[in-house]
Amino acid sequence: MKFQSKRGFTLIELLVVIAIIAILAGLLLPALAKAKSKATGISCLNNNKQLGLAWLMYCEDFDGFMPPNQNGGGSRGWVNGWITFNANATDNTNILWLVGSKKQVGPLYPKLGPYTSSPGIYKCPADNYTAKMGNKRVARVRSNSMNGFIEGAAYNGGKNRGSTWYSSHKPYNKLSDISGKDQAGAFGGGVTSPTELWVFVDEHPDSINDGWNIMNPNTDASWVDLPASYHNGGGTYSFADNHAELKMWKDPVPKTEPVRQSSRNGFSNRGKRKGMNDYWWVIERSTSRL
């Protein structure tokens, strides 16, 4: 009886198989990463919508008045605390500055706290940045900020005054204030209805600090506070009618602004497109001229 020996792989054949697997992996991994980023983008949109719903519930309970949105970490705002990359900053991990009650926190309690039960909605799921606390790294509790032109009577100004920071432009204290000229920035376009006024945004990890996000409506030379680009170069916004959008950035800032893990503000708008660019897109959804 004759036995036929079984032929094994040659080295060349094995290398070909390995090369094919490597090529397939190279094709599939970016697609998987993009799919994961898309999934976190959807989750982030949902978080912003939940915050927007809490914001509207507050407005309904207070006769249309919006929650106060005062700058500064020790302010009476919709949230409190100061998010930073500085070591041993307790605000980085204090969820009571997000969802704490007046009984728990005192008069500086976060005004949306009673309307939100889950601290997770205050953070983008793609925000994996940490800060040092003692001898370990810990996750920071918040990624979101509110439109700085939404003041919610935080500064006790008169009915007909301009924004506390940019007097030629409109602030918003009540829902009934959401109207105005179709003109905000250099190229037309401004807030005329709730569908056009953004309320919450995910802020760039280096830029975020208090719960307040402002931009200069008179020039696009630099971003005072910078939106994030966690989702394939895009960032999420929620609006006063409680719809949410994923804005895909086109300009280098904010699309590819690096995260240095160093708290900073004032981002040069280098590489911006001439004319209507990402900066003016945000301004036209932030306020309108008086």
Go through the PLM ranges and name each one:
Residues 5-36:
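N-terminal single-pass transmembrane signal-anchor helix
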Residues 42-290:
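Short, well-structured segments within or immediately adjacent to enzyme catalytic domains
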Residues 1-2:
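N-terminal hydrophobic targeting signals that begin at the initiator methionine
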Residues 39:
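Phosphate-proximal small/polar/acidic motifs at interfaces that engage nucleotide phosphates
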